[in-house]
Each structure stands twice: as structure tokens, then as C-alpha cells.
Amino acid sequence: MNKDFFSKERFKYIIILALFNYIFLGTEYLFDNIVGDIKPQSVVTAQSYILGASVLGFLFFAIIKKYINKKLKYGLLSAFIVVETLLFALMEYSESYGFVVITGCVMFALFGVMGSAVYYISSVYLKSNRNVASTIGLAYGLGI
């Protein structure tokens, strides 16, 4: 590995990607546990719903990026964090399978938007770099 690989800028993107992966995967695991406590036979189905919602959020980022100005984008991402936190708290204390799945879908759709933003920003930085796979692999490993 060359000294370019260990640059301060690359390290910043590795940390950003790792944090996102850690938060996303940890929340997904916790969601599965919450659903498992309420309705164990439906964990896999509920997980497929939230992962589908995160894909929709991932795709929705393109619309946000294209049609919303820069200041509003930062405001939206900040609002998403607050909403996700509130939804998570509501979901944690709910005993209704339907409510948990609906709040989980909304929360993971917002995660999808945020994940798309994180990966987009990282890919813009890494576009002309030869070590993209190593960077993303390292970030994913750190996130787990």
C-alpha cells in the first residue's frame, strides 16, 4: 500500500462510511430483536419490509439532490436524524407489530436517504482513486 492510501482525507471517508454502516447494521439488528419479541415468526418478513424501504430511500436521495438547494439539504438531513431518533424511541417501547413495522419502514427509508448521501459524497471523493475497493472494504469491516 502506498502512502496515498493512508492520507488524512481518505481516513475521514473511511470513518464516515464505517459510522454509517455501524449505525445502520446495529439499528437493523435491534429492529429484528424488537420484532422478535413481539411476533417471532414475522422477523424475516419485517426485515424485508425495512430493507425495501431503505432501497426506496436510497433512490429518493437522487430526487433530493436534484431538486432541493444545498442549505435545505443539510436541514433535511439534520431533521432526518431527529425523526429517526424519535421513531426509534417510539418503536423501542411499542408492543404493536404493525406500529413497529411502519415506524421501522419510515426510519429505514430515512436511513436509505442518508446512506445514499454518505456513499455519494464518498464516491465523489474516491472517483479518481485506485484504492476504492480497499477503502470501502475497510470501512465496512470497521463498521461491523
Predicted regions and their residues:
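Central cavity-lining transmembrane alpha-helices of secondary-active solute carriers
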Residues: V44-K66
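Glycine-rich segments within core transmembrane alpha-helices of 12-TM secondary carriers
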Residues: K127-I144
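Pair of pore-lining "gating" transmembrane helices in MFS-fold secondary transporters
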Residues: N2-Q47
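Cytoplasmic membrane-interface "Motif A"-like loop-to-helix N-cap segments
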Residues: K66-F80
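Hydrophobic core of transmembrane alpha-helices in multi-pass small-molecule transporters
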Residues: Y97-S116
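Juxtamembrane helix-start elements in MFS-like secondary transporters
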Residues: I38-L51, V100, V132, I136
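C-terminal ends and interior cores of transmembrane alpha-helices
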Residues: A79-S96
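Intracellular juxtamembrane helix-capping segments at the cytosolic ends
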Residues: G112-K127
